[in-house]
Amino acid sequence: MSRIGKREIELPAGVSVELASDAVVVKGPKGQLSTPTHPKIAYAVADGKVQVSRTDDTRVARAQHGLRRTLLANLVEGVSKGFTKTLEVIGVGYKVATAGNTVSLAVGFSHPVDFKLPEGIEAKVEGNKLTLSGIDKVLLGETAARIRRVRPPEPFKGKGIKYENEVIRRKAGKSGGKK
């Protein structure tokens, strides 16, 4: 039995889970999210808790068991609390600004890079930090990764866009002497 899959999901106050034939819909104070169901996974809602179980013991069912439980737990947390991810822009002259649903990055190119945020993701800038927030953890992570990919941190000086708590492995520069 999957150690993650067999744990129950507690539903906070104001969060409801509806089971449809092809999706699980989670509604809460911050919005509504859904995830597709899998034919080998069964869901049961009772007493403010959701139990995820598998219909048989095949390899596919075992693989999906923990995954589907975690996806559902992320939806429950998203519609009740929401998620945030912070990126840091490090480098001389590197700047970040927001205008509506667009993030403008000046990160050493000859032009600023304008990044359009997907629906449901909000951005806030404080100095050199860009804080992204939203209710969908998967979409938030993808968006943060796409912004980081514009100028990933380089190992020599550490310049670029990095996650707030990311540790950059630094390399020594050229060490050859003059002849």
UniProtKB/Swiss-Prot annotation:
<dbReference type="InterPro" id="IPR019906">
    <property type="entry name" value="Ribosomal_uL6_bac-type"/>
</dbReference>
<comment type="similarity">
    <text>Belongs to the universal ribosomal protein uL6 family.</text>
</comment>
<keyword id="KW-0689">Ribosomal protein</keyword>
<comment type="subunit">
    <text>Part of the 50S ribosomal subunit.</text>
</comment>
<dbReference type="GO" id="GO:0003735">
    <property type="term" value="F:structural constituent of ribosome"/>
</dbReference>
<dbReference type="InterPro" id="IPR020040">
    <property type="entry name" value="Ribosomal_uL6_a/b-dom"/>
</dbReference>
<dbReference type="Pfam" id="PF00347">
    <property type="entry name" value="Ribosomal_L6"/>
</dbReference>
<keyword id="KW-0699">rRNA-binding</keyword>
<comment type="function">
    <text>This protein binds to the 23S rRNA, and is important in its secondary structure. It is located near the subunit interface in the base of the L7/L12 stalk, and near the tRNA binding site of the peptidyltransferase center.</text>
</comment>
<dbReference type="GO" id="GO:0022625">
    <property type="term" value="C:cytosolic large ribosomal subunit"/>
</dbReference>
<dbReference type="GO" id="GO:0019843">
    <property type="term" value="F:rRNA binding"/>
</dbReference>
<keyword id="KW-0694">RNA-binding</keyword>
<keyword id="KW-0687">Ribonucleoprotein</keyword>
<protein>
    <recommendedName>
        <fullName>Large ribosomal subunit protein uL6</fullName>
    </recommendedName>
</protein>
<dbReference type="InterPro" id="IPR036789">
    <property type="entry name" value="Ribosomal_uL6-like_a/b-dom_sf"/>
</dbReference>
<dbReference type="GO" id="GO:0002181">
    <property type="term" value="P:cytoplasmic translation"/>
</dbReference>
<dbReference type="InterPro" id="IPR000702">
    <property type="entry name" value="Ribosomal_uL6-like"/>
</dbReference>
